[in-house]
Amino acid sequence: MTQLISVNSRSYRLSSAPTIVICVDGCEQEYINQAIQAGQAPFLAELTGFGTVLTGDCVVPSFTNPNNLSIVTGAPPSVHGICGNFFFDQETQEEVLMNDAKYLRAPTILAEMAKAGQLVAVVTAKDKLRNLLGHQLKGICFSAEKADQVNLEEHGVENILARVGMPVPSVYSADLSEFVFAAGLSLLTNERPDFMYLSTTDYVQHKHAPGTPEANAFYAMMDSYFKRYHEQGAIVAITADHGMNAKTDAIGRPNILFLQDLLDAQYGAQRTRVLLPITDPYVVHHGALGSYATVYLRDAVPQRDAIDFLAGIAGVEAVLTRSQACQRFELPEDRIGDLVVLGERLTVLGSAADKHDLSGLTVPLRSHGGVSEQKVPLIFNRKLVGLDSPGRLRNFDIIDLALNHLA
């Protein structure tokens, strides 16, 4: 009899075949299209025949932490609580990184699978995600970033550098993601986990547009690993945490709205607080600039007036109240500001100009965060069954689809 587990009000059938769910960070669908057109992704091209290729929506804000945690909980941020890479903790009155598992409000499917007796493995590119994804997980869990520190007691596996045959990659490199895939292949070949979650970094997508030689080479690398996983009998399910767009004008200059500077000029200093949830320890490739921001208002600043002021700025797509944003994007009310501001497709939002170091932006700015980066792929190496009319699909449906609806 098929064993079921229930997690966050959804049921999952435990698979008898190794299942690999892959989150390709920043995978705007055009990257795949261009790689296929260039003949660089033959395995992905074949999936239109024997697999399933769909499109879904990611969570907004379209950032790494909220979406990875939505995928592994099968639920939106209103359930699991992770609504950014960075947030303002109103209890401590401090701006803090959301990398600690203490901020997680829901169990993960990964941990519950392990409790049910499955061997579960998690490999992330950046170490910032490891504590969140590995929360209460008794299995294998490590990052490529700190692969030289992997040990049996803490990570469930050892000698990973020797097994993979690669040195520890730079966190700002395509090699960081390739290490994830190579480690996944080693685990599949040797330990053969029942379920594996692989999460990459979007360094390449931040630097290189779809169809460029660098982007096509990166997708060719991934395609070769997808094929090898398939040849070893694994169920392969691929999605993304968010898309990616250029955030520049016609000649490649960054389109940045420094909201804190604009609000200070309008209302005075210390009257508002702009918080950018894209902020994380790795800012070189995006300068902590994304298309989503939250704004906290002091008592003397009228909300309606602030909404009208922000909405009138060229490049702003929408301004929502806290309740509107939480309803539309399924966010936790106690962890966002009074207002949510969304940038248009070609525009990013900053705080104050002197708080952003743009020296690392050696190529035209590409970033994410808004609704313009919400469309992501849902790709499987099997046919879907039992979904005559799937309706709106989300990236956090991928584990349900991979375990409950594949032929």
Swiss-Prot record:
Activity regulation summary: Completely inhibited by EDTA and 1,10-phenanthroline. Moderately inhibited by the phosphonocarboxylic acids phosphonoformate and 3-phosphonopropionate and the phosphonate herbicide glyphosate. Partially inhibited by the reducing agents sodium sulfide and dithiotheitol and the chelating agent iminodiacetate. Nonphosphonate analogs of phosphonoacetate, such as arsonoacetate, sulfonoacetate and malonate are poor inhibitors. Inorganic phosphate, acetate and the known phosphonotase inhibitor phosphite have little effect on activity.
Binding positions (substrate): T64, D202, H242, H368
SUPFAM superfamilies registered for this protein in UniProt: Alkaline phosphatase-like
GO biological process: phosphonoacetate metabolic process
Free-text function comment from the UniProt entry: Specifically hydrolyzes phosphonoacetate. Does not have activity on other organophosphonates or acetates.
Family according to the record: Belongs to the alkaline phosphatase family. PhnA subfamily.
Xref: Pfam families: Phosphodiest (PF01663)
Cofactor binding note: Binds 2 Zn(2+) ions per subunit.
Residues the entry annotates as binding Zn(2+) 2: D202, H206, H368
Positions of Zn(2+) 1 binding: D25, T64, D241, H242
Complexes and interactors: Homodimer.
pH dependence of this protein's activity: Optimum pH is approximately 7.8.
GO MF annotations in UniProt: metal ion binding; phosphonoacetate hydrolase activity
Native species: Pseudomonas fluorescens
Temperature dependence: Optimum temperature is 37 degrees Celsius. Activity is rapidly lost after incubation for 30 minutes above 40 degrees Celsius.
Keywords per UniProt: Hydrolase, Metal-binding, Zinc
Enzyme Commission code(s) on record: 3.11.1.2
Stated name of the protein: Phosphonoacetate hydrolase
Induction behaviour: By phosphonoacetate.
